[in-house]
């Protein structure tokens, strides 16, 4: 059994050694088995594996780049070791959907923020209203939902308002109220709700 494993490893090294652009000894010194597998799969499918054959990419990141190359995507948008795996996936999904990933292919956005921007782009929403890293992904999500409902979000699409406050402002606007009395991020959502209900009784 041990001999079979050794023979397999040796054969595997021989196969990888046929690959250009690499020094044999350096290749096996810098990459682990999973990374080598991704490099070899790129070689086997005639992809430019040199794009992701860098020790700073773990095998999962290499895989995302390899998948992108296979689909003929512009992987330069996410072939950056500073991106986390989830961020890479969101950028790749955007490229697959043919949206303008320049809106969110930025290190400062978390994968969840990227997802909210991507989903907005896929629905042709005005993502400029929330494509700001100062928003949490939950704030982005709420603004996106409101935009899908054709709501005017300009009064509350601000990082200073949390989601609960945004909801109270939206509820007031839906009722045709002048929300100015509680349009202030220093007023907590419970107080906003009290003011809103009071305004409703006076309407």
Task: Specify the residue positions occupied by each region the protein language model found.
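General marker for long, soluble alpha-helical cores
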Residues: 2-203
């Amino acid at each position: 059994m041990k001999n079979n494993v050794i023979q397999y490893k040796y054969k595997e090294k021989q196969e990888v050694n046929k690959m250009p652009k690499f020094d044999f000894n350096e290749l096996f010194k810098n990459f682990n088995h999973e990374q080598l597998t991704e490099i070899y799969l790129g070689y086997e499918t005639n992809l430019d594996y040199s794009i992701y054959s860098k020790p700073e990419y773990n095998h999962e990141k290499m895989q995302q780049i390899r998948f992108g190359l296979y689909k003929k995507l512009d992987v330069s948008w996410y072939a950056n070791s500073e991106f986390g795996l989830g961020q890479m996936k969101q950028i790749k999904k955007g490229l697959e959907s043919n949206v303008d990933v320049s809106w969110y292919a930025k290190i400062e956005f978390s994968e969840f923020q990227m997802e909210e921007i991507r989903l907005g782009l896929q629905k042709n929403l005005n993502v400029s209203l929330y494509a700001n890293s100062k928003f949490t992904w939950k704030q982005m999500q709420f603004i996106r939902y409101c935009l899908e409902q054709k709501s005017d979000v300009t009064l509350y699409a601000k990082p200073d308002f949390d989601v609960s406050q945004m909801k109270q402002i939206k509820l007031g606007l839906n009722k045709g109220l002048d929300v100015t009395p509680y349009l202030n991020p220093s007023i907590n959502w419970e107080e906003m709700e009290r003011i809103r209900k009071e305004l409703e009784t006076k309407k």
